[in-house]
């Protein structure tokens, strides 16, 4: 393939990767940002139910109202292609809840693989473009162990992620809010 053909192929790949999703199916993602826009809380329960074909291997997952999430934990250098918010936000919130609570804690990496599998299925069910879904899934499989362990350590150290009350001042940061344990359920 000549240089023109290579350029056209790259352009087609990038066009597909960056194509906005239209016609997303499912509930809206009800989120409110903290001041720095690095953490958010959801304003109602969010539930993922596996499709019929997946019910044998996966259970429904519900992230509760006022759960605090960072949405998709995508490093800043990749934001032009995969911003932290996108059609994958709903699956990312469910995934964050599972990484926080680690509800299927059975034996090491299998637990994380289960949560990552839920993310993959939820993105497919919400018709996240395939290239974006694959990039996100492969990244969490390759690099998610640190977040999994960090969440277990934070929970063990007393950190909470479900709010009892929400900030009333738009200048409130997550770093400030999480210092007061009275803010949590």
Regions found by a protein language model. Give the residues of each.
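Extended terminal accessory/targeting regions
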Residues: 2-185
């Amino acid at each position: 393939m000549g240089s023109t053909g290579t350029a056209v192929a790259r352009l087609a790949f990038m066009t597909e990767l960056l194509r906005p999703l239209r016609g997303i199916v499912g509930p809206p993602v009800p989120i409110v940002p903290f001041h720095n826009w690095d953490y958010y809380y959801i304003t109602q329960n969010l539930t993922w139910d596996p499709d019929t074909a997946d019910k044998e291997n996966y259970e429904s997952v519900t992230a509760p109202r006022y759960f605090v999430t960072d949405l998709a934990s995508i490093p800043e250098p990749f934001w032009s292609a995969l911003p932290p918010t996108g059609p994958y936000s709903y699956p990312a919130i469910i995934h964050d809840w599972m990484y926080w609570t680690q509800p299927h804690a059975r034996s090491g990496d299998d637990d994380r693989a289960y949560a990552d599998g839920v993310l993959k299925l939820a993105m497919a069910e919400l018709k996240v473009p395939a290239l974006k879904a694959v990039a996100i899934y492969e990244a969490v499989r390759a690099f998610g162990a640190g977040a999994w362990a960090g969440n277990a350590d934070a929970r063990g150290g007393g950190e909470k992620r479900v709010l009892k009350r929400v900030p009333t001042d738009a200048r409130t940061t997550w770093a400030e809010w999480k210092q007061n344990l009275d803010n949590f359920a």
